[in-house]
């Protein structure tokens, strides 16, 4: 019985100390009082580009196994819609499966 009372009292003391009152003023650099503004950008919801077209997101590319992939042309990074992942037929099939899974989790409408 005494142990349970000690545990309850200790818990209440910790709760009172841990949670500051609403009347307390925030310190200038107090991280709990800083606010962040989140900017939501409009993204493509339906496909508009075919294989070989430049893209920014998977949702822009048409096709279940087509993703917005990165290739390097003359040392520059270029994003374009692609579905081929390898010259090997088995690896290409596995790559298309992975592309399908990636598109599934892109949540394009």
Swiss-Prot record:
GO terms for cellular component: extracellular region. GO terms for molecular function: ion channel regulator activity; toxin activity. Expressed by the venom gland. The keyword Nuclease does not apply. The keyword 4Fe-4S does not apply. Disulfide bonds join 47-62, 55-68, 59-108, 61-81. Residues 19-46 form a propeptide. Keywords: Disulfide bond, Ion channel impairing toxin, Knottin, Secreted, Signal, Toxin. Transmembrane segments: none annotated. Residues 1-18 form the signal peptide. It is found in: Secreted. The presence of a 'disulfide through disulfide knot' structurally defines this protein as a knottin. Belongs to the neurotoxin 25 family. F7 subfamily. Putative ion channel inhibitor. This is Hainantoxin-XVIII.2.
